[in-house]
Amino acid sequence: MAIALIFDCGATNLRTIAINEKGQILASHHLANNTKQGIESSDYHIWDIEEIWQKLTSCATQTLNQLMQQGIDLKDIVGISVTTFGVDGAPFDENDQQLYPIISWKCPRTIPVMENLSNQLDIKSLYQRNGIGQYSFNTLFKLHWLKTHKPDVFQKMAKFVFISSMLTQRLTGQFTTDHTMAGTSMMTNLTSGNWDPSILASLGLSNNHFPPMRYAGEKVGKLRTPLAQKWGLNPVPVISCGHDTQFAVFGSGAGLNQPVLSSGTWEILMARTQHAEPRFEFVSQGLTTEFDAQSNCFNPAVQWVGSGVIEWLGKLLFSDVYGSDHYYTTMIKEGEKAFNAGKRAVNFEGIFSQLGQGNISGLSMFATRGEIYVSALQHMANKLKNGLSVLHQVSQFQAKSLICVGGGSKNVLWNQIRANTLNLPIDVVDISESTVLGAAMFTFAGVGIYENVNAAQQAMQPTRKRIYPN
């Protein structure tokens, strides 16, 4: 048996997971993650890398103990990789010392920087080159903030290191840059697949300010001897992974030109394509394009608030069962009754995640809460249809099916409405850890357990349940 040990640094939880070459999770442990208050303002958010590292190493010890309790030989662990949220990182000096804390994606300090971007760069040209939408947490804005507000730090910066690579450096001693993390920064070029010289020049930086790029599946280095001895492991390879989103998509089993919907508080619709055409007219719809986990491929994506709206509605209309074991089943049961009844008058329009931008029409004294609930699900399905149309236009493909993962994929009524609205089959993936599975696929391919990552994906494919339009 071959085992991969995955370190996953999430915004909510820090975890280590041991998974075998068949995609089975053997052991795991997690601890809560949280931001700290910035020094300059109580509104600022930073990540404490020392605390994150201490918690992850503790998780690793617990996970390995679980394996030993099962009688599993720790020498079966053949590789390690790290996944994290995107964009965040920190500056280091020429002596490899961190100069400033990791500014969290939650921090509002970069909002004014984003709002002022048009005074420094051609926004349309920038977007067409790197494909990344204007989000205040983008790495570009963090570096601009450091340059303006911490010029001494910025001047001493010999390299900027993303958080995933800060962790792999502690595992191996080697500084690198995960390609999937670079692709979230707003500083890369979709055509070259590398850093964009003109964007870096606007900061007074060059490629030399970033450690060598590593593609997913490439070797970062070997596990440092002190850690190998501490954990009872061989000095196994540490394999580059990086941004969690890319590995969640790959772990779902998605091939090229296959859209994947991650349905949670936010719904994120992505595809794996060989074509990337960021069109500025779709910026308002949230179109962003990142590097895929595989080289020379891309992940165009659109997003909108999904279950967040449904939960708001549920609390209002189903308050009698909210918080009970019957909450979701009651909503779905009453929704199915309204759905099967056919014609509905209630209609949702607009954006319900913004103040005063959502509208509900067609209400009457005869409308049931089940009908209102179904109409909300239909509204979300319409957003999905519009989002898929955008991906079709910018990536030159026509979807034949849709993969659905995440908490919202467990709602059978919602899935049926999605299938009917798209007139496409929906494949619901039966896995809660698609990010970990995707990272393990690249890890096993990187150490030679599988010939390549496509073979790993095929062998470790999660099970699916297909729902057809009716």
Swiss-Prot record:
The family database entries (Pfam families) matched by this protein are listed as:
FGGY_C, FGGY_N
GO MF assignments: ATP binding; glycerol kinase activity; L-fuculokinase activity
Q: What cellular component terms from Gene Ontology apply here? A: cytosol
**What InterPro entries does the record point to?**
ATPase_NBD, Carb_kinase_FGGY, Carb_kinase_FGGY_CS, FGGY_C, FGGY_Carb_Kinase, FGGY_N, Fuculokinase
**Keyword Amino-acid biosynthesis attributed:** no
State the signal peptide span.
none
GO terms for biological process, alphabetical: L-fucose catabolic process; rhamnose catabolic process
User: Which SUPFAM superfamilies does the record associate with it?
Assistant: Actin-like ATPase domain
Q: Which UniProt keywords apply?
A: ATP-binding, Carbohydrate metabolism, Fucose metabolism, Kinase, Nucleotide-binding, Transferase
Named cofactor requirement(s): a divalent metal cation
Q: What is its EC number?
A: 2.7.1.51
Pathway stated in the Swiss-Prot or TrEMBL entry: Carbohydrate degradation; L-fucose degradation; L-lactaldehyde and glycerone phosphate from L-fucose: step 2/3
What's its catalytic activity?
L-fuculose + ATP = L-fuculose 1-phosphate + ADP + H(+)
The EC category is transferase
- Report which superkingdom the organism of origin falls in: Bacteria
Q: What does this protein do?
A: Catalyzes the phosphorylation of L-fuculose.
Q: Which family does it belong to?
A: Belongs to the FGGY kinase family.
Q: Per its UniProt record, what HAMAP family does this chain match? A: Fuculokinase
Q: What is this protein called?
A: L-fuculokinase
Q: Which organism is it from?
A: Haemophilus influenzae (strain ATCC 51907 / DSM 11121 / KW20 / Rd)
Organism phylogeny: Bacteria, Pseudomonadati, Pseudomonadota, Gammaproteobacteria, Pasteurellales
